[in-house]
């Protein structure tokens, strides 16, 4: 027996094992094959049990790694989700093909997984992709893990798997405390402000809500606002930006020095501005190309 609010989880990829464990008073399932067994979600849903779904190739006999972020996202769609599914993008070296850079990109794009509308689990405790950044051994890597834990929670992680429970708890509380406050109100009409900072993050939510992958990219390009400061502009370049802004709804705030300005708009706005102001000067073309490339 244990004290406190411990939750007992059975790690299995087979629905028969999950059913037996849940019927024997286990609380949840950890499926490292990501519902490769198509009956797993049915078993968990029928028992109203939470299930952690780890991204994996769709092979029940050979769990493995999925390398690219887009492929991880698709793997987590396999055989659907239950109301109590927790998605796990699966950090770590499950195969030789998966590199530290793959894990770093997944961590960098962690907010995208909020597009499922489900809780996110991260297993990042002393992982290689973090230790390598700081040049630390496994024994020395606790501070590295704690820093990443705060960042993961701020980016949307709800569950953190760890071997350093007390310290990780504190790091998670700091991440939660200083996460950006968003609107969330329940009523006759519920309102929730989504945590969206990039076009790719917006596209995940648009795709979930509309079910139209073809339309999601265009809609997502209107979802975030970026602010850039341009300096060293001449009068002709500023005039071209003013003219383009009247067509694209780009907001310009001109500096008092006569050569700088702030440009405020969505990725779609900046894309239209780059087209409308094209050809005035190679310097302005290059600056606008850097902006549009960063907002794609």
Language model: regions and residue ranges:
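Active-site-adjacent loop and "lid" segments of alpha/beta metabolic enzymes
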Residues: 1, 5-8, 16, 28-72, ...
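Haloarchaeal acidic low-complexity proteome signature biased toward cell-envelope/secretome components but also
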Residues: 4, 62-70, 78, 173-244, ...
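Phosphate/pyrophosphate-binding loops at sites that engage ATP/ADP/AMP, CoA/4′-phosphopantetheine
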Residues: 72-85
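Active-site pocket-lining segment
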Residues: 88-97, 102-105, 216-224
């Amino acid at each position: 027996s244990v004290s406190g609010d411990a939750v007992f989880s059975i790690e299995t990829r087979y629905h028969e094992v999950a059913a037996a464990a849940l019927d024997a008073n286990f609380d949840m399932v950890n499926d490292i094959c990501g519902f490769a067994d198509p009956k797993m979600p049915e078993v968990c849903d029928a028992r109203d049990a939470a299930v952690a779904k780890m991204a994996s190739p769709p092979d029940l006999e050979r769990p493995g790694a999925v390398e690219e972020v887009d492929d991880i996202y698709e793997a987590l769609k396999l055989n659907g989700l239950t109301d109590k599914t927790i998605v796990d993008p699966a950090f770590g070296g499950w195969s030789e093909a998966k590199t530290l850079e793959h894990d770093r990109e997944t961590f960098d794009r962690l907010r995208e997984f909020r597009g499922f509308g489900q809780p996110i689990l991260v297993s990042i405790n002393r992982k290689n992709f973090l230790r390598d950044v700081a040049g630390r051994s496994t024994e020395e890597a606790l501070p590295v893990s704690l820093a990443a834990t705060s960042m993961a929670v701020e980016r949307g992680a709800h569950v953190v798997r760890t071997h350093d429970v007390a310290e990780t708890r504190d790091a998670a509380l700091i991440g939660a405390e200083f996460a950006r406050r968003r609107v969330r109100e329940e009523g006759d009409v519920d309102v929730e402000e989504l945590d969206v900072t990039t076009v790719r993050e917006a596209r995940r939510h648009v795709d979930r809500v509309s079910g139209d992958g073809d339309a999601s990219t265009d809609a997502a390009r209107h979802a975030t606002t970026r602010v850039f400061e341009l300096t060293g502009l001449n009068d002709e370049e500023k005039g071209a930006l003013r003219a383009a802004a009247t067509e694209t709804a780009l907001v310009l705030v001109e500096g008092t020095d006569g050569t700088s300005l702030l440009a405020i708009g969505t990725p779609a706005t900046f894309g239209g501005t780059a087209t409308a102001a094209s050809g005035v000067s190679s310097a302005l073309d290059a600056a606008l190309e850097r902006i549009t490339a960063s907002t794609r």
